[in-house]
């Protein structure tokens, strides 16, 4: 599995600000979107382009345009919505597929409860976004769902990832690509990433 820890100074700086315990909902939400945008820039660096001719101000001009598979952005509800706008800044014409999966706090197992995928998803590249890759259960369940629907070109974008989640994802889906702003130390006894970001969903939506 291709694993990319994005080490750009802007990514590290913005992620560091997100780790502040008393950060406001507004600021956390803004930074989640901004880091999501920067991760998208990295994740789409290998997209193929083609030369096309358009009408320029002084006659025909050749330009480069992205070719190949169309894109669907797949936020995992609910926290993934906090990264979605940042992703769409770079791929504004992408279709949006939504997957709802929550983690049972006692068993740590993923529980699917909603899905709405775009048509012709088998012809698209999926950018799956979720702030945290902890145990990997929710991400694996989401990718299972996408593959069952025919989508096999999948890239995962997360703000922070635990080594345990990375190992689980690689074992289940070695063909996906992972882009993260940080590979953190690991999980605590409750399955939360350390140092992590706390509950990203609560911080994005202002709930407890």
From Swiss-Prot:
Amino-acid positions noted as binding uracil in the UniProt annotation, renumbered to this chain: 193, 198-200
InterPro entries recorded: PRibTrfase_dom (IPR000836), PRTase-like (IPR029057), Upp_B (IPR034332), UPRTase/APRTase (IPR050054), Ura_phspho_trans (IPR005765)
Pfam families the UniProt entry points to: UPRTase
UniProt record, GO biological process: UMP salvage; uracil salvage
Binding locations of 5-phospho-alpha-D-ribose 1-diphosphate: 78, 103, 130-138, 199
Pathway stated in the Swiss-Prot or TrEMBL entry: Pyrimidine metabolism; UMP biosynthesis via salvage pathway; UMP from uracil: step 1/1
Cofactor: Mg(2+)
GO molecular function annotations of the record: GTP binding; magnesium ion binding; uracil phosphoribosyltransferase activity
E.C. number: 2.4.2.9
Regulation of its activity: Allosterically activated by GTP.
Cofactor note: Binds 1 Mg(2+) ion per subunit. The magnesium is bound as Mg-PRPP.
Top-level EC class as recorded in UniProt: transferase
Catalytic activity: UMP + diphosphate = 5-phospho-alpha-D-ribose 1-diphosphate + uracil
UniProtKB keywords: Allosteric enzyme, Glycosyltransferase, GTP-binding, Magnesium, Nucleotide-binding, Transferase
Family named by the database record: Belongs to the UPRTase family.
Function as written in the Swiss-Prot or TrEMBL entry: Catalyzes the conversion of uracil and 5-phospho-alpha-D-ribose 1-diphosphate (PRPP) to UMP and diphosphate.
NCBIfam families: PRK00129.1, upp
Name the record gives this protein: Uracil phosphoribosyltransferase
């Amino acid at each position: 599995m291709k694993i990319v820890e994005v080490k750009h100074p802007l990514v590290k700086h913005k992620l560091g600000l997100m780790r502040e315990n008393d950060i406001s909902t507004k600021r956390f939400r803004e930074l989640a979107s901004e880091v999501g945008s920067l991760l998208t820039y990295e994740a789409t660096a290998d997209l193929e382009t083609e030369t096309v001719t358009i009408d320029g101000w002084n006659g025909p001009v050749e330009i480069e345009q992205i070719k190949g598979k169309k894109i669907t952005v797949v936020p995992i509800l609910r926290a993934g919505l906090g990264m979605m706008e940042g992703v769409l800044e770079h791929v504004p014409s992408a279709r949006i597929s939504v997957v709802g999966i929550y983690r049972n706090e006692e068993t740590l197992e993923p529980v699917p409860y909603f899905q709405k995928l775009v048509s012709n998803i088998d012809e698209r590249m999926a950018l799956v976004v979720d702030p945290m890759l902890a145990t990997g259960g929710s991400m694996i369940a989401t990718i299972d769902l996408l593959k069952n629907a025919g989508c096999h070109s999948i890239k995962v974008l997360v703000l922070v990832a635990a080594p345990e989640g990375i190992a689980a994802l690689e074992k289940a889906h070695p063909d996906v690509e992972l882009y993260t702003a940080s590979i953190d130390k690991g999980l605590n006894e409750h399955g939360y990433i350390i140092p992590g970001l706390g509950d990203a969903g609560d911080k994005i939506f202002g709930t407890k």
